[in-house]
């Protein structure tokens, strides 16, 4: 895609990966340097943290569909603009339609913006279950943030437990 300028600074687009009919879809903000180099979603230390969180719920990575709101990394890891998010919106919408997950875990503010078109603070969005194309959306903190802010891991775990309860319902 060359819909916005992000394509110029990336090595490759990170489209998504995982089970084609997964119950869980995890949507991150944007690929980072680790993902751009590896060519996979949620790579590096943040990916390892996400894998551990999912394993704690009994979910191997292979049973989850992983993607990002943006398909290209942003320069220096800066936050995405609303225009950049809008350029990738159709890809994300199509992924949700194809996978048909039972729950979407939106990990980060950009992921929440892409799915919910909301500019509310992440702390407020994570307090209630939202919806995208009829699929419940649980908003939580991104793994890279949790690596820097250990105190919020308990909140993220609570959010994952809410998502798990929606899948089991």
Segments predicted by a language model, with ranges:
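A polyanion-binding, active-site-adjacent surface
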Residues: 1-169
């Amino acid at each position: 895609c060359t819909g916005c300028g992000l394509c110029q600074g990336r090595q490759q687009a990170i489209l998504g990966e995982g089970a084609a009919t997964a119950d869980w879809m995890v949507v991150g903000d944007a690929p980072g340097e680790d993902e751009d180099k590896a060519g996979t979603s949620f790579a590096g230390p943040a990916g390892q943290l996400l894998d551990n969180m999912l394993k704690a719920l009994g979910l191997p990575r292979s049973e989850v569909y992983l993607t990002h709101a943006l398909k290209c990394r942003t320069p220096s890891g800066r936050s995405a603009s609303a225009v950049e998010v809008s350029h990738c919106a159709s890809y994300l919408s199509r992924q949700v339609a194809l996978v048909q997950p039972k729950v979407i875990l939106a990990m980060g503010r950009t992921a929440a913006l892409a799915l919910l078109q909301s500019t509310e603070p992440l702390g407020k969005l994570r307090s209630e279950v939202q919806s995208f194309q009829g699929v419940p959306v649980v908003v939580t903190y991104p793994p890279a943030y949790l690596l820097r802010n250990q105190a919020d891991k308990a909140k993220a775990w609570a959010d994952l437990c809410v998502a798990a309860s929606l899948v089991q319902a």
